[in-house]
């Protein structure tokens, strides 16, 4: 079948993806081969494909396709994450549009809506990944709320609780008033923001004295339960044992003493609000202070807010300052830069809040995971992230794992009374009943007497088990799949979830398998625009990946994404990269169209130039293959692509095909053609991980193949010894060919016209390639001479001098005039450069690079003058 003139990406991509799916090439089963396993970082079930997903999944597909070609049993497990906060927010918003308030629904009713939403939107991003060419084992697709996955999470919670690692505590937590849930410390993003520092005067009870405190949050004075001073601060010695009065609410509070107060900072007086600040809570515990919580879960003030009850905290801030000013309590207001914690999910300003929550003790669990990275059992790529990882793991805090949400795994704690300890933890209510009866010595307890904790577990508490749970390794720890596929090989993910997810997976791996979950962690950079801004919907600077693939084809976009994506460094994305990728795909297509159009002659002998060209390219291929293997080994995927790109574009298309291409109207020798096809097939194998669609299309067009011979399951090229000398000699020969082409172009000598070439040979490096030089330069006669040739144009390549007789080809007088003018200009340029180099102040004062550049200019000018003089001598 004749090839289309233009590569039709859409048609070809659909054809081959369907073919791969129909023939089950992506599916893996346990067998005798060595496994190569990747688990996908599960995108949010609510998500659609963005540029970060494109980069991350292209990298994974490159690794998995290469492993498949290398003969490994390649298994790439896809799936999605239930994303508690994000999904619940979307469902609540949808219900609001429909006029339904979540508060009026039971948990079961709300979950029906959540599952409906999930079934409707959950598959979108995975379908989009298929357009990219992702060769996931779709039969293994997992969702973190699948029954098996959820059961694994519950089992782990119960196990860790019984080991004493999970506890329930009344602690200061990060509260997101928009999502109405707690967040872990890692889910809080701190940003420098400009605010105000308000100086407020508190009256001292029973006197005319006042104390001045400074606060950035004047609305919280309604929760103040003490003023703290340093016992060594002589300014306030007279206030020991006294009390102060909180403005507006007129609460009488003690003036306490504690060395925690820095006498040099602010006014030396500290307002203590134990319900709304972690440090204040510690002071409150130490001094037995009352706790007054002024906020509702949605960030509005409660009854302790007095006449501000029901108003948002930020509205109250403005109004309370106005009231305090009218009372004469505000002594001054200063602008102030300070760090403000915001929710990683909703962007809302976080409130420190005291709450009964569930926590996982991390210090002891984290140690094996820290050792694994420091001892290189788990490799972070690039290594610059090791110190960041170590710092976090050495300072790890207990993980708040409960969330005030309904969407997610419900915490398996069952309460049988009103006391804080009146609960049991069990995998199901039947088991919980037995435990509750034992704990209370009350066999009359019934399941109806038990109430399950309404909170859900943090989403990360399910995804930290991902490499184990996708193979059912929690529920069936000795099943054949977990024993075969675990530990996985490579994880490709973003540095921003190094702690949210990667570190915790390593912790879970050692806790539940006594083994690392993966060997290598490839940390991608952030995709940014040309102005170095992170791509985001809100900025409107992120192109739609589906639109990009429609325009440039999936292969083109894959190449574009990878051309500038070194591990751990940010990718400065420019759509021109996709254009370049598409151009590369078209180059491959046109190269094959050229080959496919050749007529083969079975009886024609292979020419010397063909033999040389094939020997050179095979060596060049093997040398590049070694470089590519090295890049893959070091996870320099963009470098592996660039080496492949240069080999195919420059060496194969621009040089090799020109060297073996039969002259116009002639046929190609059968032996040459077969060897060209053989090296083309090797090219397609190393191209396949990067451009799977076009490589499979060409592979299948070369000859009829059955399903076992598809490119996707072919064999990666074997490393072979290569001839460094022939590569070096070609580099020299290519200089000679370029010199001939330059003279033809400059002197308007048509390529159709044959020319003679004489070589004053001081270096024999080009002799092996004489046949190639003659073919590509259209040389009628190539001679080796011992003296310079008169009446000829000349150029140099290393120590060889080349002469092209020009009798009748050019106007000699015009050429002499032109060369004389060029010589004069070059001599003038040389004089100015040498003037600089004779100036001691310049040589001693300028940077080394600048001086070196001038010396290079001098050397280049001297060489050019010598060539021009030789050309003039030859013409006179």
Regions found by a protein language model. Give the residues of each.
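Non-catalytic terminal extensions that flank enzyme cores
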Residues: 1-51, 74, 331, 344, ...
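C-terminal low-complexity, glycine/proline- and small-hydrophobic-enriched intrinsically disordered tails
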Residues: 579, 701-876
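Metal-dependent nuclease catalytic cores in nucleic-acid-processing enzymes
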Residues: 58-75, 278-283, 287-288, 321-324, ...
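Residue patterns forming the tRNA-binding/recognition surfaces of aminoacyl-tRNA synthetases
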Residues: 15, 22-23, 92-210, 221, ...
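Protease-associated
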Residues: 208-272, 278-282
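Acidic, turn-prone loop/beta-hairpin segments
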Residues: 81, 173, 177, 184-189, ...
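N-terminal catalytic cores of NTP/NDP-binding nucleotidyl/phosphoryl-transfer enzymes
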Residues: 29-91, 144, 153, 213-215, ...
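Alpha-helical recognition segments enriched in aromatics with Gly/Pro capping
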Residues: 259-261, 287-299, 405-408, 413-416, ...
């Amino acid at each position: 079948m004749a090839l289309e003139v233009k590569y039709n990406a859409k048609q070809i991509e659909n054809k081959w993806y369907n073919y791969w799916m129909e023939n089950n090439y992506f599916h893996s089963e346990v067998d005798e081969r060595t496994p190569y396993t990747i688990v996908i970082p599960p995108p949010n079930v609510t998500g659609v494909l963005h540029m970060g997903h494109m980069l991350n999944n292209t990298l994974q597909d490159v690794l998995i396709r290469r492993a498949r070609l290398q003969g490994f049993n390649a298994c790439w497990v896809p799936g999605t994450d239930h994303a508690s906060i994000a999904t619940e927010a979307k469902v609540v918003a949808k219900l609001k549009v429909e006029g339904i308030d979540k508060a009026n629904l039971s948990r079961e009713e709300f979950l029906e809506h959540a599952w409906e939403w999930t079934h409707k939107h959950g598959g979108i991003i995975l379908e989009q990944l298929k357009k990219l060419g992702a060769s996931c084992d779709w039969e293994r697709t997992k969702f973190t709320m699948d029954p098996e996955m959820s059961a694994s999470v519950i089992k782990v919670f119960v196990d860790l609780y019984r080991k004493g690692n999970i506890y329930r505590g009344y602690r200061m937590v990060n509260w997101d008033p928009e999502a109405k849930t707690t967040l872990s410390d890692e889910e809080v993003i701190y940003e420098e923001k400009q605010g105000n520092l308000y100086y407020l005067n508190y009256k001292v009870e029973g006197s005319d004295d006042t104390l001045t405190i400074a606060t950035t949050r004047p609305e919280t004075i309604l929760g103040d339960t003490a003023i703290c001073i340093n016992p060594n601060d002589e300014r306030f010695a007279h206030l020991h044992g006294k009390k102060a009065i909180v403005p507006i609410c007129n609460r009488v509070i003690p003036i306490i003493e504690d060395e925690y107060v820095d006498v040099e900072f602010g006014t030396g007086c500290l307002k203590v609000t134990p319900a709304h600040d972690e440090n204040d809570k510690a002071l409150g515990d130490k001094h037995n202070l009352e706790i007054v919580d002024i906020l509702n879960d949605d960030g509005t003030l409660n009854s302790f807010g007095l006449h501000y009850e029901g108003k948002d905290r930020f509205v109250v801030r403005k109004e309370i300052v106005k009231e305090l000013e009218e009372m004469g309590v505000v002594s001054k207001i200063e602008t102030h830069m300070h760090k403000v914690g915001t929710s990683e999910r909703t962007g809302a300003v976080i409130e420190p809040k005291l709450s009964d929550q569930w926590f996982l003790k991390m210090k002891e669990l984290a140690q094996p995971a820290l050792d694994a990275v420091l001892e290189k059992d788990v490799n972070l790529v690039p290594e610059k992230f090791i110190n960041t990882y170590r710092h976090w793991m050495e300072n790890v805090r207990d993980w708040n794992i409960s969330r005030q949400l309904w969407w997610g795994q419900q915490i398996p704690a069952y309460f049988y009374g009103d006391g804080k300890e009146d609960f049991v933890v069990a995998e199901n209510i039947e088991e919980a009943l037995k435990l509750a009866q034992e704990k209370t010595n009350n066999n009359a307890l019934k399941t109806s007497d038990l109430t399950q904790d309404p909170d859900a577990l943090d989403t990360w508490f399910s995804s930290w088990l991902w490499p184990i749970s996708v193979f059912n390794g929690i529920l069936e720890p000795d099943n054949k799949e977990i024993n075969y596929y675990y530990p996985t090989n490579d994880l490709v993910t973003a540095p921003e979830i190094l702690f949210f997810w990667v570190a915790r997976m390593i912790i879970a791996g050692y806790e539940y398998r006594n083994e690392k979950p993966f060997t290598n962690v490839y940390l991608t950079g952030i995709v940014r625009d040309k102005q170095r801004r992170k791509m985001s919907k809100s900025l409107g600077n992120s192109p739609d990946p589906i639109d990009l693939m429609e325009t440039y084809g999936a292969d083109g976009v894959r190449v574009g994404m990878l051309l500038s994506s070194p591990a751990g460094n940010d990718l400065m994305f420019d759509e021109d990269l996709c254009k370049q990728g598409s151009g590369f795909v078209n180059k491959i297509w046109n190269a094959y169209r050229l080959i496919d159009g050749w007529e083969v002659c079975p009886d024609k002998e292979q020419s010397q130039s063909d033999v040389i060209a094939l020997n050179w390219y095979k060596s060049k291929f093997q040398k590049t293959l070694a470089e590519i293997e090295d890049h893959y080994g070091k996870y320099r995927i963009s470098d592996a692509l660039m080496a492949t790109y240069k080999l195919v574009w420059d060496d194969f298309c621009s040089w090799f095909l020109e060297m073996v291409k039969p002259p116009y109207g002639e046929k190609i020798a059968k032996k040459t053609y077969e060897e060209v096809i053989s090296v083309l097939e090797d090219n397609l194998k190393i191209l396949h991980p990067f451009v799977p669609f076009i490589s499979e299309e060409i592979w299948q067009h070369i000859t009829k193949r059955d399903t076992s011979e598809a490119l996707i399951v072919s064999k990666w090229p074997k490393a072979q010894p290569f001839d460094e000398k022939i590569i070096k000699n070609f580099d020299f020969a290519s200089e000679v060919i370029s010199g001939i082409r330059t003279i033809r172009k400059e002197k308007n000598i048509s390529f159709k016209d044959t020319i003679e070439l004489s070589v004053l040979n001081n270096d024999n490096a080009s002799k092996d390639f004489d046949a190639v030089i003659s073919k590509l330069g259209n040389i009628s006669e190539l001679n080796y001479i011992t003296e310079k040739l008169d009446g000829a144009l000349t150029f140099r390549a290393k120590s060889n001098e080349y002469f092209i007789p020009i009798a009748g080809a050019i106007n000699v007088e015009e050429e002499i005039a032109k060369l004389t003018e060029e010589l004069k200009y070059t001599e003038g340029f040389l004089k100015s450069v040498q003037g600089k180099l004779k100036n001691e102040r310049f040589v001693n004062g300028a940077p080394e690079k600048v001086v070196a550049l001038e010396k290079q200019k001098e050397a280049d000018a001297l060489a050019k003058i010598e060539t021009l003089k030789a050309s003039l001598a030859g013409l006179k």
